[in-house]
Amino acid sequence: MKFLIVFVALFAVALAAPAAEEPTIVRSESDVGPESFKYDWETSDGQAAQAVGQLNDIGTENEAISVSGSYRFIADDGQTYQVNYIADKNGFQPQGAHLPVAPVA
């Protein structure tokens, strides 16, 4: 009987907890062309992302896309993190205050 009372009490507390508010989009822009793109968005909770991409060496065997941008998010610990990056023929190259930096060879 005690188990049932404790279970019902915990269930009631769980139902009474306030629901987390879903973030809404406060800004969203994009422009997509045949050889380039860009986008920029932000949500009400402070998350954001922006990027610009461009097709390089069009019409050659070295044709490749390069993208530069950044994104910002709030982690489970409540801290905001930002990552700036370049993604091109050399791979994804992120930078951020919270990311380790490779030693210079």
UniProtKB/Swiss-Prot annotation:
Residues 1-18 form the signal peptide. The keyword Amino-acid biosynthesis does not apply. InterPro entries: CHIT_BIND_RR_consensus, Cuticle_Struct_Prot, Insect_cuticle. Residues 34-103 form the Chitin-binding type R&R domain. GO terms for biological process: chitin-based cuticle development; larval chitin-based cuticle development. GO terms for cellular component: chitin-based extracellular matrix; extracellular region. GO terms for molecular function: structural constituent of chitin-based larval cuticle. Keywords: Cuticle, Signal. Component of the cuticle of the larva. This is Larval cuticle protein 65Ag1. It comes from Drosophila melanogaster (Fruit fly). The gene is Lcp65Ag1.
